[in-house]
Amino acid sequence: MAVDESMIGFDGRLSFKQYLPHKPTKWGIKVWEIADCSTGYCLDFDVYTGKAYEQASPNGIGYDVIRKLTEPYQNRGHHVYFDRFFSGLPIMEYLKDHDTYASGTIMTNRKGLPKALKKKKLAKGASAFYSKENSDVLVTTWKDKKQVNLITAGSL
C-alpha cells in the first residue's frame, strides 16, 4: 500500500481549496489517499480542510494521516510506503508495533535520527546505515546524484 497526497480538480469557491504547484491538477481539493500498490485502486481517502483539518498530535499531521488511513490494515502484515512528508521515527515505531511494515524517504533533520546522519558526506556510490539499539527501524543513506535517505521498519 502507498500513502500520498492527491488533488481533486475544483474551480469553484471553497474555503479549503488548495494550490499545489507540483501536481498536474494545481487547484482543487487536497486529499490524503491510501492506494493498493499492485492495482493502484484507492482504498480510502481523507479530505484535507486546511489548518483547521484536525488538531495535529505532537508527532505532526503526517503521523496522524498515516495512523488514520492505515488503521483498518494494521496487524495484518501489510507493507506501507510513503514519502518524506509522512516519515519519522514515531510513525515507524507505531506501525512496527502494530505488525505493519513501512518504508519511506526521510529528511535528516527529523527528531530521533542520529546526528552523524546529518553530517555524513558520502562519495558517489557509497552508502551507510544506522539502526537504533533494540529496534527494527533502519535508516540507510546512499549517494547517487544527491544523497538519498530511506527509513524502514519491521522488514529487516
Q: Which residues does each predicted region cover?
A:
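Acidic, contiguous segments within the catalytic cores of piggyBac-derived transposases
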Residues: 1-156
